[in-house]
Amino acid sequence: MGEIKKKFVQWLEKLLIRLKEPNVKEESLFEDLSPSNDVDTDGKYSKALSWGLENKKVKNIALTGPYGSGKSSILNTFQKQYSREYSFLNISLATFNTDTDDMENKLEKSILQQMIYRVHDRTIPFSRFKRIKHIRTKSIIINLIFFFAFIIVGIYLFKPDALKGIYAETLVSRSLGTEDQQQIRLTILLALFFIVYPLLAYKRIYHFVRANLKLNKVTIANTTLEKNTGEENSSIFDKYLDEILYFFEASKYNVVIFEDLDRFNNIGIFERLRELNELINNSEQIDRRVVFIYAIKDDIFGDADTEKLTRDRTKFFDFIIPVIPIINASNSGDILKKKIKHSPYSDLINTHFLEDVTIYIDDMRVLKNIFNEFVIYQQKLSAIDLDPNKMLAMIIYKNIYPVDFSKLQYNKGLVYEIFQKKQLIIEEQIKLINAKIQQLERKLANIEVESLKSIAELNFIYLSELEISNLNSNYDINIDGEVFRGNTSNKDRFFEKLKNADTIYCYLRNRNGPATIKEIATVFGRKPNYFEREDAIKAIEKNEIQKFKKELLELEREKQEIRAQSLQVLITKMNSKDVFSDKLYEKKLLVYLLRHGYIDEMYNHYITYFYPESLSLSDIKFVFSIKNHESLPYSFELDNIGKIMSKLVGAEFKQIEVLNFHLLNYIMDHSEYRNYYDSIIERLANGSKESVTFIDGFKERAINKAAFIQSISSKWDDFWSFIELRSNYTQQKKEEYLSDILTYADIADIIRMNKESVMSFTLSKYLNLLSLVSDEEKIKELLLKLQVKFKSLDHLLNSETIYDFVVQRNLYEINIKTLSVILNDAPNITYAAVKNSDQQAVINYVNDNIDIFVEKVLLTEEIEEPEESFLELLNREDLDKRVKHAMIMKKTFAISDIGELIKELWPIVIRENKMVACWSNVITSYVEYNKKMPDFLIAFLNNPVNRKELSKNNIEAFDDKFDEAILEDISEEIINSRDITDETFEVLIASIQSWIYFPLGNVSEKRAKLLIDNDLLSLTPENFKELKLNFDTLHIQLALRNPDEFIDKQGDFSLDANDIKQLIDSNELSQFNKEIFVQHLNSNCLTDGNNDILKDTIYFINEHNLKITNELLTFLLESPTTLDTRLSLLAGQIKHIDNESITEFLTKIGEPYSEIAEKGRRIKISNNRTNKALVTALESKNYISSFKEDRERLRVNTKKK
């Protein structure tokens, strides 16, 4: 009972509310899309149409104009005004499929159907077109009553007795036998009904049979009559022409209006309609004129202005009425503005937007529909705070590009694709920024590891590695035709040339042939890239480290801005064609809407219904970003975070998209969301760039910074490692983080962060540590547990407690700065100074860490360590060999006595020229290495400074310290060593021994000559023979170096004809010595001589009138020289020999000269200068009696018997 009462009360309340509501009909904003009937305000079009219809000659009228120009509205207006004067038949072919086959027949069929089915079947009862008829129940009942009445009347009229049994006691039966006039009239009426009803039934049956029965074939006996079926291939109009004529005969239509025929671009249908019009108007059975009116576009007969187009238009139509468009691109904006002005949205729509966008709209129906749909969408989605301009833009897009709009609902189409492409473009821009970030990070990494201080130092190292820095190097590198080697002056331009090289050829120790820039810059992969190191050094010189770090921060911010960038901004910044596809770029309206942001990333809200409850648009966008995994800027504003929380689930708080400054502050302020807070902290502790960027931004916005830093520190062990090593933050920002961590993080968490001692290292170098944290006890605990080693102690002097704690616990590095403070600002922190100090703790600390002391103190500055303590350090077994090598290479010193240094260091000491250049050290090293010259010792000797110093003393001066044999061995090694350069040998030759005999088989000609020139080879037969054996002329030079000695011992040397010739031809041998030499020649020396040498020897003898031995004379007279040469020699020697010898020599010469030796003879010989000299000498010697000179002969008279 109570439930019924409750419902009754509710019903009454609703009734009262309805009664209170004013019964005012709200004026609708909507407007139908059908043609208007009140557009012809001035009546011009109606008058023109009326004139055409009244003109008997006009049967086809064209109303022409573009789509949307108002043709249908004009016709509607005309029909409204002249509905009594004319009967209008409207035929519209508003189909959108214009590509079907057999188009003309389909059009004719559609026209015929619209005619036939336009009128009631009663109007054209004889039409063969079937149609479904609805028979009402009332009609069925009436027909049945008439049928049964007909039966009863028939029985009554023709067999009344049959009814007596049924109606014996009825009122009817009592009236049958009466003669009452009324009864008679009733009978007559019934008889008439009996006659009329069958006639009416027959008429109906006839109509049915005629309309539905089709006789195609009749067979009688063996004969078949078949109807002609050729009409099946004829057109629809031809096939049903009788139906059309019957239609107009039976109906009253005299004006037929055709619309939308021009959609099909089919000229044939106009031809068929014109023919049909002629048939209708010429038909005798149709007693009226029928006019066809066509609403068509101007270019229906062609899209090019030709004479044929003009003729076709005027041929087809009897009267053409042009229509001036009601709307076009220039006035559509005014029309739409007018509509909006009279709506509740007049103040919400931007006028400039309307003016711009309506340029693309030139159809009134489209314009009306845009407004209608805008009103519906705006009312339906009014619960969400949407931009009306964007709403209108979306509706315009929906109407102008309906197919793409439909695709957008299913994440397809051009609009969807461009927003997808936007993400790809953003990712490409992010990639470019990441590349810049990587480049800067690589630069910073190179700067951190770079140890060199200048480009000159870098050039020297790389050129040395390439082996083209040494002046004596034979290696070179050819860059674009320019050769670079050790002895050229263009080495300073090497790397500048290399940077832009096209072709590179190298000729090096281990590489010959072409090379690449990278190969040369990295010394064939053995060293870091030269140009990267060059950039690093330049950056260090310009102090650009902080600049690079600031650039990194700016790039990270730019990444965040780009990720939040709208498509509108993207289009503005980029070339439109790079954003829009070619297909989309053709759709200018859509491009406009996208370019100006009227269709943006929030388009989903404008095309789908969303139940927002109390969520704002930004809240919805944020929720969607999480659901769709599309990140928004971390600072994105949120309005109702409580409602947002209700829309999210636990797993979503682990997504990167959930990161938002306002959201996290809200969660931190509400303890009930602790689980969500932990999920976000775990997400932030993964070390990703997104997480770190968020932490950096939120740190200063957090409502509880201490709790946030403590949470991050507890979850992220690499927190400080990332900040210090990988973040590339500026120094100031790093200090801010360090202060926050030391202040808010737990000690256990800080210790856990100290991976690879990063935190310890950081604290050790901070000079303002005490200003970062005020809690001294916490500092002490951290310093001890982290084993911090301070790089400097100056800043700790302000706190005596901390300073003493650090010194007592050895929490400082051994370096110049710390030891200088501890040792009271000592000027030079040498090992000797440490040993001589009174601070045993420092001495012990240094000795326990001697390697560190040497590296961080001795090797960092040019401190002169006394030789005694320096040798002590080098000889220490606990000092690392690597450190010793570094000492030798970096420190300036010279070992006076190499023997006092441990042997293993000799090679590097000698190689680095850290040994005093004296023969004692050289010989000691030579003896130590088994009387061999190791390469480092040879390099020491080749050093210009060293060889000059050694040349000041002769090696023989050390015979009291070393055996004579050792001195000879090292001298011989110096002479024979090919590794000792000729330049060095020229200098050292003054210090080595001289040799009575030295084997020269391994000595170069140049060095042999130097030995001769420096008188280190004595003139001995052994040295003479050794030189002659190994060289062409040096034995002669040795002889000429000592001419007097050579002439004195001429017989001790093995000479040949060539030697004799060289000596005779030499300008260095005096004429006197030459004469003595020739006079004492042994004939054996000339046995291997050729005729030229023998002839030259004879010539020299004759020229200088020398007396030679009979032995030599005999040899020369028997030599194969010319007779003239031998006769001239004999002629010159006759005065030096006796007659007996003359006789012997003349006999050796042969006839006719041998006959001169016979007495009592008269001999004839040729008269020439040689013969004349001979007989003259013989006559002077009184060897012949006389001679007489004829013209051609000389007559010689010998002595009488």
From Swiss-Prot:
The regions listed as transmembrane in this protein's record are 140-160
Q: Which InterPro entries match?
A: P-loop_NTPase (IPR027417), YobI-NTPase (IPR048428)
How does the entry describe its membrane topology? Answer: Single-pass membrane protein
Could you name the domain of life of the organism this protein comes from?
Bacteria
Can you say where in the cell this protein is located?
Cell membrane
Regions annotated as coiled coil: 420-459, 536-574
Q: Give the UniProt entry's GO cellular component terms.
A: plasma membrane
What start and end residues bound the annotated signal peptide?
Answer: none
Q: Where is it chiefly localized?
A: membrane
- Pfam families the record matches: YobI-ATPase
Q: Does the keyword Transmembrane helix apply?
A: yes
Q: Which UniProt keywords apply?
A: Cell membrane, Coiled coil, Membrane, Transmembrane, Transmembrane helix
Q: What is this protein called?
A: Uncharacterized membrane protein YobI
**What's the gene?**
yobI
